[in-house]
Amino acid sequence: MKLGIVGLPNVGKSTLFNSLTKAGAESANYPFCTIDPNVGVVTVPDERLKLLGDFYHSKKVTPAVIEFVDIAGLVKGASKGEGLGNQFLANIREVDAIVHVVRCFEDSNVIHVDGSIDPIRDIETINLELIFSDLEILERRIAKVTKTARMDKEAAKELDFLQKVKTHLEDGKMAITMEMENEDEEAWMSTYNLLTWKLSLIHISEPTR
């Protein structure tokens, strides 16, 4: 599994990445410390592996791994090229699921790109950029399918579905909150690789040590 760590600049994404992977990626108190994505691979501890290996007399036991990708900070307007722009939305599109790091702590020594601490606003900022990016994907797909929809019943069905997804996103909702009505819809959705269709975990704090 490949997990992308995302969030606004300077919220602790690289710090979390280093904590998970022990990779030693640069982490500093200024926006866009990370430009190129950092990648780390972590094995998943599982006590059952040894038992299964012993039972089947396996010569080699290979644990599951998780690949973490520390992606540069997104800002308002990223889908239109602001900050470090679409390059990093593309990096998110390559992962299986999203870990969204949200700043909840107060510290005057740590810069916030929007000047104040507001976790709900920050979550909405990132979600909107993901939505805007997905809308561009949908609009391109709609333009393509429209060309064949009049002559192809399956294309016409997909076009109706695309319009439904587009309306859902335009209402400010993530694609993953949509209920698929049949197998065709599930199959179509899986081919679009929408950012808002990916599973997402919001990380807000770490225990004080």
Task: State each model region's role.
Residues 79-201:
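Phosphate/Mg2+-binding loops and adjacent switch elements
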Residues 71, 104, 206:
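Residues immediately flanking
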Residues 1-76, 82, 86-92, 98-100:
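Conserved G1/Walker A P-loop phosphate-binding module
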Residues 202-208:
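Residue-level detector of conserved catalytic or cofactor/ligand-binding positions
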